[in-house]
Amino acid sequence: MKKIIAIATLALAPTLSFAGGHASLGGHGTARIIDSHVIEGKSGVLVRNISSDVWIWDNPPEGFDAATGAECTQYIACAKGQEAPVGGTVTCRVIDGTGDVLINTGTFQPNNSVLLSTIAATGKWAAFVGAQWVGTTRHRIEGGSVYDFKPVN
């Protein structure tokens, strides 16, 4: 079971990803798992991870913080007896240094990336609703990861 949690954590680390939207707003981030829970079903296993992330923007626009803290919740599905995920989702929430908020949601892709979309935002983030990123894991460590995110649109 511990192995399933570790594999699922590492597979989904890039979900610890980003919101934003313009072609220049990419970056990298770190994720540290702060809570993990395994739910066993008859034919599969669900893993829920909650992480504390730091998103570091490559070229933040004027008025944006260079880094943003986020809390992300991942749900990862694995077939019973298998360690590789069959799919998953992530939702990240942010209240930035100036009090603006955003919510990102993402789905795991067959190429081991995560496709993220900003679904709700206020203040300076409001213009990014509908923006998408692709997150990929650069480095995995037990209990966390380092990842990159690039804008799709």
Positions of PLM-derived features:
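Generic cytosolic/nucleocytoplasmic N-terminal low-complexity/intrinsically disordered segments
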Residues: 1-2, 41
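Sec-dependent signal peptide recognition
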Residues: 2-9
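Beta-strand-enriched cores of mature, soluble protein domains
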Residues: 20-153
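N-terminal signal peptide c-region/cleavage motif recognized by signal peptidases
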Residues: 14-17
